């Protein structure tokens, strides 16, 4: 009895092994027949098969009921100048609700969840044919916690984009254009396409740059230059950034407007894709990539103060590798020192000679400026006298009389002699006053009085002149007696007395000053 039970168990095990082996052989045979078809293993979001011309995908557990509380996202991507057509099998059921608020299928025209909404679907009737306007389509399936259904199965294919039929569509193949970069940092630039002749002039550009960071590092991307020839026309030109691989589900950012922001990747592999059609070949970009690790930083790395640690070799290299310029902020002194050393080595002799010449000229100039004023002062002290000092600082008309010093001395001698004669005449004329009055009468007295008043009034008036006119040949005798000449024939004695009396104010003025006789004579002119 026990032997029979053991045989039965062995038979069951043998049958099970044969069934498993048969399934494995069948699977291998099917894989060999489907060359070029990529199978996505069964996951919580169902099966997704992709080919070069399209593919198909389904809801989880299809054709059985899908599980509750599920959310699956499918992003379809066609080649450039192509669009996507999406169809559903007739076996279709998603929990119906008003405006499909519960279980539903959401489809958008583009690669993002914020792309234009095509529609939301639910119920028992499968959607009609859906066609995208570009090369991307975003699809999301969502279920709530109750009332599950059969689900769906969809097929998609790629068709030529009618907007590019004049360029040949998919009949005009795009050349293969791929580049690879790696290391602590580097530059990704679109000009590399022309330099390496990856495409010919007039052809569209669809190039991919694959970046690999250093071990255990991530990638930071910063645009140094960016310009799209046709801004905001993503069909014609764009730059896309992928994180990890070039699969559409790894799309991190896409730029086709006028601004491109920095991108921080979560993996050590980044993919940059640039697309530009035949009419957008002037589009360009230049991007810096930097490998970084997260803190804490080691001794061989530099802390960027932005959750980044970069290699020490990137510090003060003239390029901003950190998100903020911490790695280049304290490098000014070092750069200036290096520049000074370079100038000293190459032009030290010229700078030294020039500096010496300038220094010598400066010293000579200072000595000349200091020594020249001292010579003038010494000369003045040596030849200084009161008369010369007075002549320099008195008004200019005093210098004119100093030039005629000899003539003035002779005139002063005559004046002194006349004054002496006047004194003698006055003493002798006292006794003969009556005789004098009898001959000249009261008229002479009035004339004398008027002459005396005239000379006394004339003196202060002439003293007010600041600068006398240039004098002619000096003749004091003629000038001082000219106004009495007309009356000399009437009374010679009175005329002589009047002439001498006119000089009395001048004599008083001369005696009242200590300067010289030059000032008294200048008043008469």
Swiss-Prot record:
Q: What is this protein called?
A: Neuropilin and tolloid-like protein 2
Supply one GO BP term. Answer: regulation of neurotransmitter receptor localization to postsynaptic specialization membrane
What does the record say about PTM? N-glycosylated.
Entry-linked SUPFAM superfamilies? LDL receptor-like module, Spermadhesin, CUB domain
Source species of the chain: Mus musculus
Residues that bear Phosphoserine = 409
Subunit comment: Interacts with GRIK2 and GRIK3, but neither with AMPA-nor with NMDA-sensitive glutamate receptors.
- Membrane-crossing residues? 348-368
Sorted UniProt keywords: Cell membrane, Disulfide bond, Glycoprotein, Membrane, Phosphoprotein, Receptor, Repeat, Signal, Transmembrane, Transmembrane helix
């Amino acid at each position: 009895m026990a032997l029979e039970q053991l045989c039965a168990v062995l038979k069951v095990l043998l049958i099970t092994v044969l069934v498993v082996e048969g399934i494995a052989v069948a699977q291998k045979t099917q894989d060999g027949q489907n060359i070029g078809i990529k199978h996505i293993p069964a996951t919580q979001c169902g099966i997704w098969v992709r080919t070069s011309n399209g593919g198909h995908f389904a809801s989880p557990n299809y054709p059985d009921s899908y599980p509750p509380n599920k959310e699956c996202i499918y992003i379809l991507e066609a080649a450039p100048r192509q669009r996507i057509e999406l169809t559903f099998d007739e076996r279709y059921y998603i929990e119906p609700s008003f405006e499909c608020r519960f279980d539903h299928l959401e489809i958008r025209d583009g690669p993002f969840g914020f792309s234009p909404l095509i529609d939301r679907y639910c119920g028992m009737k499968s959607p009609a044919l859906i066609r995208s306007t570009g090369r991307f389509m975003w699809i999301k399936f969502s279920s709530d916690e109750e009332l599950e259904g059969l689900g769906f199965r969809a097929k998609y294919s790629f068709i030529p984009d009618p907007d590019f039929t004049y360029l040949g569509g998919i009949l005009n193949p795009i050349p293969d254009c791929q580049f690879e970069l790696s290391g602590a940092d580097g530059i990704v630039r679109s000009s590399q396409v022309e330099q390496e002749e990856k495409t010919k002039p007039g052809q569209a550009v669809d190039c991919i740059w694959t970046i690999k960071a250093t071990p255990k590092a991530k990638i930071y991307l910063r645009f140094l230059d960016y310009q799209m020839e046709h801004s905001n026309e993503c069909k014609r030109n764009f730059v896309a950034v992928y994180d990890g691989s070039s699969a559409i589900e790894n799309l991190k950012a896409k730029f086709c407007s006028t601004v491109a922001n920095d991108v921080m990747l979560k993996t050590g592999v980044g993919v940059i894709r640039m697309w530009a059609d035949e009419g957008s070949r002037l589009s360009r970009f230049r991007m810096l990539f930097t490998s970084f690790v997260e803190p804490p930083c080691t001794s061989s790395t530099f802390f960027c103060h932005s959750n980044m640690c970069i290699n020490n070799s990137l510090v003060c290299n003239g390029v901003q590798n950190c998100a903020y310029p911490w790695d280049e902020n304290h490098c000014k002194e070092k750069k200036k020192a290096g520049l000074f050393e370079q100038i000293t080595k190459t032009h030290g002799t010229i700078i030294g000679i020039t500096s010496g010449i300038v220094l010598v000229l400066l010293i000579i100039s200072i000595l000349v400026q200091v020594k020249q004023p001292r010579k003038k002062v010494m000369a003045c002290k040596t030849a200084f006298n009161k008369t010369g000092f007075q002549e320099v600082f008195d008004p200019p008309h005093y210098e004119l009389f100093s030039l005629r010093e000899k003539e003035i001395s002779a005139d002063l001698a005559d004046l002194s002699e006349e004054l002496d004669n006047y004194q003698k005449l006055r003493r002798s004329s006292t006794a003969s006053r009556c005789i004098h009055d009898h001959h000249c009468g009261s008229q002479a007295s009035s004339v004398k009085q008027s002459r005396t008043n005239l000379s006394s009034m004339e003196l202060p008036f002439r003293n007010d002149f600041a600068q006398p006119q240039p004098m002619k040949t000096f003749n004091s005798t003629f000038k001082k007696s000219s106004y009495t000449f007309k009356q000399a024939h009437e009374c010679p004695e009175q005329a002589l007395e009047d002439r001498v009396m006119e000089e009395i104010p001048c004599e008083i003025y001369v005696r009242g000053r200590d300067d010289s006789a030059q000032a008294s004579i200048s008043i008469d002119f």
